[in-house]
Amino acid sequence: MQRHVHRADLGERDPDYIRDYLPWLWLVASAWFRADVRGLENIPERGPALLVGNHSGGNMIPDTVILTMAFSTYFGAERPFYQLAHNLVLALPALAPLRRFGTVAATPENAAGALDAGAVLLVYPGGDHEVSRPVWQRNLIDFDGRRGFVRQALDAGVPLVPVVSIGGQETALFLSRGAGLARALRLDRTLRLKTLPISIAAPWGLNVGDFLGHVPLPAKITIQILPAIDLHERFGPDPDVDEVYEHVVALMQRTLDELAAERRLPVLG
């Protein structure tokens, strides 16, 4: 039986908590990952928007943490910003404070609720499929054909903002998604997990599932935020979902290729 995912309480996000912890968390992220976030000015200054990103780094989600810190530093903690994550990530004790930074379970209902409330929302269409891709695919945008983010933006009538990151998939040696193992253990039915990633990561060595998290390698992480897309202005009064999807993925892949060309060595950047 599939585990029920509850509708998020958007009030769990705590601007005072964010203001208290933001300076030193941003300092740690900047020092460990040499974080470089570009294009924050491309996020609309006010009102709701849907940020769509590629996802890397396993359950430790370094790209999410860095972008959340950068957003709150740039716009202020009072501007509502939410991030969708797998329910299992929110269950990890080490990541429980993310709720107070605005992380909520990835469901269409929670996404609609955040956008209806006028918030900026970050989604990762690739989810567990993309975040657990093997290291040799680290520079590949792979949403697994998931187009829900396009429909979400159209239904809410909000601009779509592509966000491209690089470096997160170098924080451990990801070897396999473990999709067959996840099916064999029926994790797709019990935990909504279609993957059981296999990696080599500190401090465990061989790491199956990443349920306890890991100590990420200090890979340089760069995040590029692209200009917002008004879907009706760009694609007409009745945008074709497939056309929008292909355009966004191609745009993000070109940007990821450009970011990859800047890097000289894995981890070091």
List each language-model region with its residue ranges.
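Membrane-anchoring hydrophobic helices of lipid-metabolizing enzymes
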Residues: 1-110, 178, 250, 257-269
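Non-catalytic C-terminal accessory region of glycerolipid acyltransferases
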Residues: 1-18, 113-269
